Every structure is written in C-alpha cells, then in structure tokens.
C-alpha cells in the first residue's frame, strides 16, 4: 500500500470530528471571500470593488509636467536595453502615444460611464455650454447647476382643466327642445336666456339679472325658439314659434309697454324661426321651419333683401346658421340631414340672385345637422355636428372643395348639442346628449384631450363667451358656467368695457 502523503497512523482510517461522532450535524456558516476556487466549485465569484483615490490637482499638474518635460523626453529616447537597438524616432512615437493615453486616462476615463454620461468634472470651472440647437441625449447623473434646460430634461405637462362648474343657476321654464337655441352670450358679457315666454339678461361679472319684458312678455307669438345678440352686442333678436322675429334694445329705458321692442319682422308663410345669425351692417339671416332662409336688412322698411330656398334649399327645419369670419360664406344645417354652404357675397344689392344654388351640400350625416361652426383659428375649416342617431363631428376644408378632413365619433348614445372653438389653445369643445363636454386638440391626430361630465341629462345648448368661458343649458333646467380655457388676463386683448356709441340704425 502506498502511504505516501499521509500522516503516520492514518492509513485506512477516516478522520471524523467529535461532533460527527456524536451524531450532530454542523451548521454551514458563511465563508469569507477567498481566491481558492476549489473549496466552493459551484460558487460564482465577483471581482472586488476597487475604490480609486484621486490625487490633488497640484499633483496631477506636476505629473503632467514631468511627462511632457523636455528632460523626460530626452531620457525616453535613449536605448538602455541589451537587445535589438531601437531608433530614437520609433521610441519617440511610442512615447508620444503612451503620453496621450495616460493623459486621457488621467482626465476623465476612470469610470465605466459612456462618453455621453456627464458624471463628474475634474476642473475648476464648469463644462462649457453646448451649442445653440444641440440636443444632448446624455443622461445627466450629477450636476452642480441648479437650473437645467427644461427643453431637454423636463417633460412638458398637459394643462390643467377645471372640471367643475364655476357658476350654477336654475332655469325653470327652460324649454326641453333639442333643436331650439335658448342661450346666447353677447360680446359685452351679457347672457340672454329664454325661459318660455320670458327673456332674462344676466351679467356674469356683476351677477346682475333682469327681465327684459318686466313680466309683460308677449304671449301671442308663442314660445321663444331662438335667441341671438347682434355682433356689436347692442341689440338682441328673438325668434318665435309663430315665425315672427322681434328686435329689442335692452339698454333702452322702459316707460311704456313694449317700448324696448324696435320692430317685428314677418315673412309670409313662415313658421317657427329656430336659428338666427347676424352679419355686419345690419343684415340678419333667419332660418324657418319650412326650410327657407331669409336675409333681412333691419335698417330699411322693406327688410327682405334675399332668400335661399325653393328647390335648391332645405326641405325641413333649419336648425343651425353661422356666418364665416369674412362673411363670404354662410352654413346652414337642417333636419333633412344636410348642411349647405351659401355664397354670402350676393346677399343684397343689384347682384342678388333669389333662391340660388348652394356652393356645396354636405349629405354624409345620418341624422339631423344640429350644429355647425366655422373654425376661429384655422381659416377654411368648417365643423358640422349630427343630431340623434348620428353623434359625429365632421371637419371640412372649404379651400379644398369641401374635402372631409376628419370624422370624430363624439357620442354613441345621442347627438352633438354644440361646438365651440378656442383660439388661445387651438382646441375644439363639443357638448353632447350624454352630458359630456369633450375637448379636442387641433393637431395632426385631433386627439381627445379632456372629457368632462357636465350633466346627467342631455345638453341642449352650448355657447362660448368672448372671454374663453362656456355656458351650457341642459334638460335638468340648469345653467352652468365652465372655465375650461383660462388665459392670463394681462395678455387678453379683448376689452371688457362696452363702447357707448356703437350701434345700428334700426327702423
């Protein structure tokens, strides 16, 4: 037997500890790190963490001076080896490469970070600022500058929208009719509200409320079916179920009954005026139940100057009327599921054509065209909203032969009650029969940015103020004001002061 390498007396025996002899099992304890991998063959070892000690800047400068000094360079060029001689030129090139490598290592490459990661700067001054327009994709881990460029490091947050109504008023007697216009907001911050036969005026700044008729409202014309302020905000026109249209001056003192009524406009055979739109210079456009659209010049006694109807017009109620900002076009929506765009350049004068053909007819809605609006911040964009069984808003480009730009599915359980455009934020607001207000951004995708439940009942009316507030009227007979487009009042160019000498000569 070969007993080489064994101690005397250990041949054929197994050495056991006293604990094993007594039947005890020794608990495995943690072991300290070791370089002997044979003890733990299945273990995975990680290299020791090295903490480098950075020298002072003075010592680094001194070392750099020694490497770049002329004396060091001369010594480096000497050949002191006993092997193959080296030329001074070759040694000089190798020494220069070594110096450049050591210099690079001594100035910032001592970490595992990438070149783009700005971790530490071993200079007395901060790193030089990047060039204008440069987008740095590096991760800024540490910075001594408290001000960071927000364009590259701070994510732009979406604006906050206040989803609760700022003012809520009761509107007893608000007619539950989806195809009548009960509200309008004038340019001098007066809101006109039709409650049955009465008309109330409410100033949203002073909270003053007054009755236009002072409990002597005319009842022989039926219910009020449409309300509209003139463009300069001095006169208000009311359409009635009988087809009559009355013009009032709210600022005129009431000394006798109906003295605030300036005149009444009637058209033979017309009934139920549900839509009114004012132009400049005293021209008022009215839509009737018969489908006819009549242009009235309120400054002259023979007020009917032109009409759009007949075989080229609508065959049912005209429910929406709006003029473009330049007054070259007028859009009308009807219960016959069509919207027509009319040429507004020949409304009055010698060039008037009675019952002309419309410029374009939109017939892609599956329900009544309940609302229509020209975009206030993007020229040439028209929005039409469908009624019951439609629930869509369709956007049209009038400059491209009324090509459809986008179709938005606003409401699946009802129609669209109103459309308001907001210029400061370039957004579109819609109200629908499901009680929701929806804000869409006018970008490439027309993205839905906010959805607000404004009511538990269908919203019948949606109007916007000249100061970026909105007012809704719902079937709960309530009026609610929302501040969805708050802007800095110091930058608001609109003047809230009403001009004193602006008006029309209404005969």
Curated annotation (Swiss-Prot):
Q: Could you tell me the gene encoding this protein?
A: fzy-1
GO terms for MF: anaphase-promoting complex binding; ubiquitin ligase activator activity
Annotated source species: Caenorhabditis elegans
Q: What is this protein called?
A: WD repeat-containing protein fzy-1
Keywords carried by this UniProt record: Cell cycle, Cell division, Chromosome, Cytoplasm, Meiosis, Mitosis, Repeat, WD repeat
Report the GO terms under cellular component: anaphase-promoting complex; condensed chromosome; cytoplasm
Any one of the GO BP annotations = anaphase-promoting complex-dependent catabolic process
Annotated region Disordered: the residues are 1-39, 74-95
Q: List the disulfide bonds.
A: none
> By its UniProt entry, which InterPro entries does this protein fall under?
Cdc20/Fizzy, WD40/YVTN_repeat-like_dom_sf, WD40_CDC20-Fz, WD40_repeat_dom_sf, WD40_rpt
The entry assigns this protein to a family as follows: Belongs to the WD repeat CDC20/Fizzy family.
User: Composition bias, kind Polar residues: at what positions?
Assistant: 15-24, 74-86
Q: Where are the WD repeats?
A: 219-258, 313-352, 364-406, 411-450
Q: Which domain of life is it from?
A: Eukaryota
Gene inactivation phenotype reads: RNAi-mediated knockdown causes embryonic lethality. Embryos are arrested at the metaphase-anaphase transition of meiosis I and lack formation of polar bodies. In addition, causes a loss of asymmetric cell division and par-2 mislocalization in the one-cell embryo followed by an arrest at the one-cell stage.
Subcellular localization: Chromosome; Cytoplasm
